[in-house]
């Protein structure tokens, strides 16, 4: 359908790709697109890191589209016996694999896999703290759907552990490309303001004032090499989005979170249950994964 062979980072997507993916995703949301379009195609989910939403979204999408879907248990594979990624990819290609969905705790490991993939298409489902392109497409589609089809000029506050967040990196790159005013709220020191970001602040109140969109991120302690990050109790005192702080944003603000949420840390129960768009975001994510698979393999 499209000419996209590898989706490793947001920059792999042309504007035409993005628009076509959103059109397809909207059709899947409205149940107007054809299922079974990938009948006979073999897709392997190669996840080196735990996942709930992303893995489920891809597995459900693959099966709904009629593909032969296999999730490789890396802990029980020959990779744990010392087999190289190159040999693993060669084996999968020899077995007729058409597309590999990869998640890794190592940044840019997916690039090495893509180099060894031969004719297999490759999707990055999140690599270390580098990128998560399908989540960025999901978030862009969610915002467009809830904000009248346009993100240009919207104030988007990305709040939390931005330094370790692949979601933040991909969203900053994609949303700024389409004219969003990106603000970053983080307790961490930022020596270099990323391209596309208009404000970096340690104050949640400053960052979310007048915001159209608030995107919350969890603390990713598993990616921290030292223990100098503040405790959850201190973090929640300074950075938890509760109803009082939410009132600083616009009345029609949408609250997003890529998951998993840590209630009582970055988001209060009241905001999570009464003001967030998280479940709609998940629904959009399922449609986006169908759209990406259809676009690349259909």
Swiss-Prot record:
Keywords: Pyrimidine biosynthesis, Transferase. L-aspartate binds at residues 81, 166, 218. Its EC number is 2.1.3.2. One of its GO terms (molecular function) is amino acid binding. It catalyses: carbamoyl phosphate + L-aspartate = N-carbamoyl-L-aspartate + phosphate + H(+). Carbamoyl phosphate binds at residues 53-54, 103, 132, 135, 259-260. It is an enzyme of class 2 (transferase). The keyword Transferase applies. GO terms for biological process: 'de novo' pyrimidine nucleobase biosynthetic process; 'de novo' UMP biosynthetic process; amino acid metabolic process. Gene3D superfamilies: Aspartate/ornithine carbamoyltransferase (3.40.50.1370). InterPro entries: Asp/Orn_carbamoyltranf_P-bd, Asp/Orn_carbamoylTrfase, Asp/Orn_carbamoylTrfase_sf, Asp_carbamoyltransf, Asp_carbamoyltransf_Asp/Orn-bd. It comes from the Bacteria. The keyword Transferase applies. Pathway: Pyrimidine metabolism; UMP biosynthesis via de novo pathway; (S)-dihydroorotate from bicarbonate: step 2/3. GO terms for cellular component: cytosol. Belongs to the aspartate/ornithine carbamoyltransferase superfamily. ATCase family. Catalyzes the condensation of carbamoyl phosphate and aspartate to form carbamoyl aspartate and inorganic phosphate, the committed step in the de novo pyrimidine nucleotide biosynthesis pathway. Heterododecamer (2C3:3R2) of six catalytic PyrB chains organized as two trimers (C3), and six regulatory PyrI chains organized as three dimers (R2). This is Aspartate carbamoyltransferase catalytic subunit.
């Amino acid at each position: 359908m499209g000419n996209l062979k590898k989706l490793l980072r947001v920059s792999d997507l042309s504007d035409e790709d993005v628009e076509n993916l959103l059109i397809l995703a909207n059709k899947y949301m409205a149940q107007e697109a054809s299922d079974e379009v990938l009948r006979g195609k073999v897709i392997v989910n190669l996840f080196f890191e735990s996942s709930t939403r992303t893995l489920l979204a891809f597995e459900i999408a693959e099966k709904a589209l009629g593909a032969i879907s296999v999730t490789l248990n890396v802990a029980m594979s020959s990779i744990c016996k010392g087999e190289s990624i190159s040999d693993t990819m060669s084996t999968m290609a020899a077995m007729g694999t058409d597309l590999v969905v990869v998640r890794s705790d190592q940044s840019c490991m997916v690039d090495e896999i893509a180099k060894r993939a031969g004719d297999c298409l490759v999707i990055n489902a999140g690599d270390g703290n580098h990128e998560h392109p399908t989540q960025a497409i999901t978030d862009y589609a969610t915002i467009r759907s809830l904000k009248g089809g346009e993100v240009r000029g919207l104030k988007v506050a990305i709040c939390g552990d931005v330094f370790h967040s692949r979601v933040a990196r991909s969203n900053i790159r994609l949303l700024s490309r389409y004219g969003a005013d990106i603000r970053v709220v983080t307790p961490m020191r930022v020596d270099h303001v990323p391209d596309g970001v208009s404000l970096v602040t340690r104050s949640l109140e400053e960052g979310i004032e007048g915001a159209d969109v608030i995107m919350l991120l969890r603390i990713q302690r598993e990616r921290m090499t030292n223990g100098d990050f503040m405790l959850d109790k201190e973090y929640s005192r300074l950075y938890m989005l509760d109803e009082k702080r939410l009132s600083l944003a616009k009345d029609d603000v949408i609250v997003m979170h890529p998951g998993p949420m840590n209630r009582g840390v970055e988001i209060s129960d009241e905001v999570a249950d009464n003001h967030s768009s998280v479940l709609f975001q998940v629904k959009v994510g399922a449609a986006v994964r169908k759209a990406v698979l259809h676009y690349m393999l259909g």
